[in-house]
Amino acid sequence: MKRGNEENNHKTSSSSSTQRLSRRKISAGEKSGNVNIPLDLTVEILKKLPAKSLLRFQCVSKQWLSIISSRRDFIDSIVTRSLTQPPPRDIKLIFHHQVLYPGPHFFIFSSTYPQNTDKESLTTRASSYHYVRGLICCWSHCPTTVDIYNPTTRQYYTVPDTNRYQYIETCFFGYDPVENQYKVMVLPKYYMEESPCQVFTVGDPIEKPWRDIQGIGVHFLLKDAVCINGVIYYQATNEYGSTYFLVSFDVRSEKFNHVKAPKILTDHPCTLINYQGKLGLIMCCKKGLEIWVMEDAEKKQD
């Protein structure tokens, strides 16, 4: 009987020690399951995901939020991928509604919304807007506000107040492909020698909020503008409104230049477009529409 009890006690102690041992193994296994993935590998994995998934995964951890929303090289890779890949199924429709009351508004509708709904993905007061390399700059002069909108992430960035102009007539948006920088340029209604324009570099904490840039003399600005290969082109008139001419603004050097153009284009207002990576001007004439294309931009600068 004693031997049997000893055997039972031995079996009990053995089984309990085995349970403790197995529990320790499970616990150790659970700890070993937390694999520490290197940061570079995490970034490469996230680069493979679609934009919609990235929006959801920002809440996974602080590290993922920082990578997706703040890491410049990661954001640039996503933008480059979206520009080189075929258009997505989720197409964004952009509308600029010009009304007197409650004022001009800017809308973005997503094609994935049901057709019978009036819910929009974005609505903001905007007198005009410019699109450059995946970002949209919306500006309003009543009140004076400038917002940068990313249609992929649906995030806003409000540009600080200029503290110079109470009434902004024109706002241009450009991208410098060399330094990989977006810049906002605001100008008063009448561009005078004593009234410099101001430039703001988006996302650069080192630069001053706004910098004064001297221009090329007195001229009256037209709102139409386009940014091509790091240069903003726009049309203007002299102070009497009798002559039209083209002006270029180099986003990197922040310098203005006159652009040489045929006289027929300086006699009438034109619509500026990006025509296969070159500056194109659309002009209405008696015969219909004419499209002029600038072949060599460097030779056309004064």
From Swiss-Prot:
Q: Which cysteines are joined by disulfide bonds?
A: none
Q: Which residues form the F-box domain?
A: 31-78
- The name this protein carries in UniProt is Putative F-box protein At1g32420
Q: Where do Basic and acidic residues bias regions lie?
A: 1-10
Query: Which Pfam family would be a valid example here?
Result: F-box
Coiled-coil annotated spans: none
Looking up InterPro entries in the UniProt record yields: F-box-assoc_dom_typ3, F-box-assoc_interact_dom, F-box-like_dom_sf, F-box_dom
- Locate the region Disordered: 1-27
CDD domains linked to this entry: F-box_AtFBW1-like
Q: Which organism is it from?
A: Arabidopsis thaliana
Q: Which PROSITE patterns match?
A: FBOX
Q: Which residues cross the membrane?
A: none
